[in-house]
């Protein structure tokens, strides 16, 4: 059967590919699979459900809750809450299942459903495949007192904020911050957490109306944040995405600071305090070569994985690493979280600034980025990207010419019908030239 789950749960156009019926069926199937695996043995099963601010999240939440309750699962409704907050409360409340209704940084018309296992971790691929296999199957429905109870949870934001602030060891007093919440799930928790930690906060994009999530704001559109940091004379700015599982930054002059630089700042700070497990940071193959070189020069090891925060987290869990992340701003600090957490990331970058007395610009300068060009090639057969001999030969030829001063990465998208061509080189012109040539080969060889 066609896969429904992508690299980050189920995503699609709300009320298009992702309907209320599918949301209900997925929830029932998830409950059945976990029950068959013995996850609910000896107790009434419990799930927590949260969502972002998209207008479609309301009907999808009702469908998910209905599916779970009809399968005999008690449900705590967390309402609008960041993805990492749902993950935290899944663990803190001892829930058997967490459900996040969000399409993260995607445009407003999209939405998604992501399931979290007990402990707040994303479900394994194998479990997601079982859920797909059980979709719309006939089953013995619970009746009477065996159906699930649905209860609004009273204090999700308060408990999450207390958890975040509790991870810090010093006050952020005296630091002025602009925080862009993307009109998304962190519009309440984000400013509250930074203020509770002592920072002076100017909050922008905190007026969600169901339609404006990620619209010209947040981590995918930094211009508003850059302007606000300069306008308010702030020390630093942070941009979250719609579900607040990622964070990018802006220094006091309005210059963007990406996930690689943020990861480097945190890695060096954790290494200094003895909290960087195995003195190694986990990144993906998309991380800039300049980041890898900076870490190795500082004596910090780098373990690289496939693209996707789930693969970063998998490497961290299997090998016992404490820090990992992506260039896009997903940062996982496993001592404090089970998934990427944008607010947590911002707090710990601010703590590093407070501890060193250095500006974000100074801290980020440890990474000298190589020029990087990313070209998305749409409407091609991405399934053939790894098997085409002509394309492989073209990549090998370009890599040989780049030598140690650059690299090529070709990657099929996990969520869209396109292939990404990434090139790093000694100069921007060379990177653009190589990426353009390879994009042309991709279009020609992988044409539909």
Curated annotation (Swiss-Prot):
Entry protein name: Phosphoglucosamine mutase
The task this protein performs is described as: Catalyzes the conversion of glucosamine-6-phosphate to glucosamine-1-phosphate.
Give the matching InterPro entries: A-D-PHexomutase_a/b/a-I, A-D-PHexomutase_a/b/a-I/II/III, A-D-PHexomutase_a/b/a-II, A-D-PHexomutase_a/b/a-III, A-D-PHexomutase_C, A-D-PHexomutase_C_sf, A-D-PHexomutase_CS, Alpha-D-phosphohexomutase_SF
Q: Please cite one Gene Ontology biological process associated with this protein.
A: UDP-N-acetylglucosamine biosynthetic process
The record ties this protein, via Pfam families, to: PGM_PMM_I, PGM_PMM_II, PGM_PMM_III, PGM_PMM_IV
Family membership:
Belongs to the phosphohexose mutase family.
**Gene Ontology MF: a single term:** magnesium ion binding
| Catalysed reactions, semicolon-separated | alpha-D-glucosamine 1-phosphate = D-glucosamine 6-phosphate
User: Per the entry, which co-factors are needed?
Assistant: Mg(2+)
What is one term from the GO cellular component aspect held by the record? cytosol
Processing and modification events after translation? Activated by phosphorylation.
**Biological source species:** Nocardioides sp. (strain ATCC BAA-499 / JS614)
Q: Which gene encodes it?
A: glmM
């Amino acid at each position: 059967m066609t896969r429904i789950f992508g690299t980050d749960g189920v995503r699609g156009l709300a009320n298009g590919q992702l309907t209320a019926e599918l949301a209900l069926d997925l929830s029932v199937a998830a409950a059945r699979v976990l029950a068959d695996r013995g996850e609910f043995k000896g107790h009434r099963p419990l799930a927590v459900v949260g969502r972002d601010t998209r207008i479609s999240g309301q009907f999808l939440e009702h469908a998910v809750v209905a599916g779970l309750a009809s399968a005999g699962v008690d449900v705590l409704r967390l309402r609008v809450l960041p993805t990492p907050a749902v993950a935290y409360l899944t663990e803190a409340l001892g829930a058997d299942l967490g459900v996040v209704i969000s399409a993260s940084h995607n445009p407003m018309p999209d939405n998604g459903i992501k399931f979290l296992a007990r402990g707040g971790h994303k479900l394994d691929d194998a479990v997601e495949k079982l859920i797909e296999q059980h979709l719309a199957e006939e089953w013995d429905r619970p009746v009477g007192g065996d159906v699930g109870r649905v209860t609004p949870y009273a204090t999700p934001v308060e408990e999450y904020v207390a958890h975040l602030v509790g991870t810090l060891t010093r006050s952020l007093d005296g630091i002025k911050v602009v925080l862009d919440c993307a009109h998304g799930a962190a519009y309440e928790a984000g400013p509250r957490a930074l203020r509770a930690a002592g920072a002076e906060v100017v909050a922008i994009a905190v007026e969600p109306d169901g339609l404006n999530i990620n619209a010209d704001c947040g981590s995918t559109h930094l211009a508003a944040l850059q302007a606000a940091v300069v306008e308010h004379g702030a020390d630093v700015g942070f941009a979250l995405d719609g579900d607040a599982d990622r964070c990018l930054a802006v220094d006091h002059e309005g210059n963007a600071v990406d996930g690689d630089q943020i990861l480097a700042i945190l890695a060096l700070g954790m290494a200094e305090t003895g909290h960087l497990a195995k003195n190694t940071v986990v990144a993906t193959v998309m991380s800039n070569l300049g980041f890898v070189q900076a870490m190795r020069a500082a004596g910090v090891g780098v373990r690289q994985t496939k693209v996707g925060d789930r693969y970063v987290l998998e490497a961290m869990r299997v090998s016992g690493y404490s820090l990992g992340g992506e260039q896009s701003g997903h940062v996982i600090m496993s001592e404090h979280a089970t998934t990427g957490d944008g607010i947590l990331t911002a707090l710990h970058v601010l703590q590093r600034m407070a501890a060193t007395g250095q500006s974000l610009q100074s801290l980020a300068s440890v990474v000298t980025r190589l020029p990087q060009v990313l070209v998305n090639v749409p409407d091609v057969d991405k399934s053939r990207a790894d098997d085409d001999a002509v394309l492989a030969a073209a990549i090998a030829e370009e890599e040989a010419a780049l030598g140690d001063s650059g690299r090529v990465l070709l990657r099929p998208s996990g969520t869209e019908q396109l292939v990404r061509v990434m090139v790093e080189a000694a100069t921007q012109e060379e990177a653009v030239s190589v990426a353009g040539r390879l994009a042309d080969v991709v279009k020609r060889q992988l044409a539909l």
